C-alpha cells in the first residue's frame, strides 16, 4: 500500500502545499519525506522513531583561525554507532513529543521538546515499516554545555549511551579533516541522512560544502603501508641478491677450475712431447738402450712416458 493510500485524504487546502524539501546531495540515497499530518495518519502497522538535534551558535575559533559556527550534539551509542538522542515511541500510549521527552529524560536528563520543535519526517529504507521523525531546537552555547554535563549523570550514560559528541562542521585544508572524517564514521539508521538534511534545511552548512564533504568520504583511500610486508620483501631481496652472488661466484670458480685443468693438460702434453724427444735422442746415442731400460724399470715411469705421448698423438 502506498503512503498516500495509507494516510487517506489530506485536509482541505493541503493539495496546494509546496513540495517537501529533499536533501539532494550526490552519493546519499534520498528518503521519502512526509508531513507530520501524513505520518500521524499512518496505520498501526507502522513504527515511529523520534530523535532530537540540539544545537547552538558557536563563535569559537579552532586554532584561532577556523570558525566553529555551531555546536551540534550527537551520541556515541552502545553498539559503536553514532546517532541523535531519542528512540522508538509507542503511539498506543504516547504522543510523539511525550514519547520523545521520556527517552530524552533517560539519556540527557534536563530537556523537553514540543511540537514547535518538529523538523521533518521520512520513510526509512528496509523491510520494516518505520517512519523517522526529527526534532531540532536551537539553544545558547551555555544551555548546550549544561545538557552535556547533565548527560554524564543520566541513567543511560555508560550503558546505552557512551557519551555525547559535537559534530565538526568545518573542513580543513586537507579536505578530510572535520566534517568529511566525521561523516566517514558509522551511523545508525537514518541518523546520517537526518544530520545532512538538518544542516541543509537550517542553513548551518551550505549545500555545496555538504556535497564536497560527502564526496571526500567516497574517494578511494591509499592503502596503509604494511611494514611487516615491506621488511619481508626487503629480506627476500637480500636473499635473492646473495643467491645471485653465490651463483656468479660458483660460475667463476668452475671457469677457473676448467682453465686450470686445461693448463695442466697442456703441460702434460708438452711434457709428453719432451719425453718422446728425449727417448728418440737417447735411442740415437750408442749404448743408450741401458738408460732407457732403466727409466722404464722405475715405478710409474711407463705412465709418465707413454700416456702423455699417446694423448699427444691422438
UniProtKB/Swiss-Prot annotation:
Transmembrane segments: none
Subcellular localization, as worded in the UniProt entry: Nucleus; Cytoplasm, Cytoskeleton; Cell membrane; Cell junction, Focal adhesion
Membrane topology: Lipid-anchor
PTM note: Myristoylated in vitro; additional evidence is however required to confirm myristoylation in vivo.
A Pfam family that the UniProt record links to this protein: Nudt16-like
Family under the similarity heading: Belongs to the Nudix hydrolase family. TIRR subfamily.
Protein name: Tudor-interacting repair regulator protein
Organism (species): Gallus gallus
Underlying gene: NUDT16L1
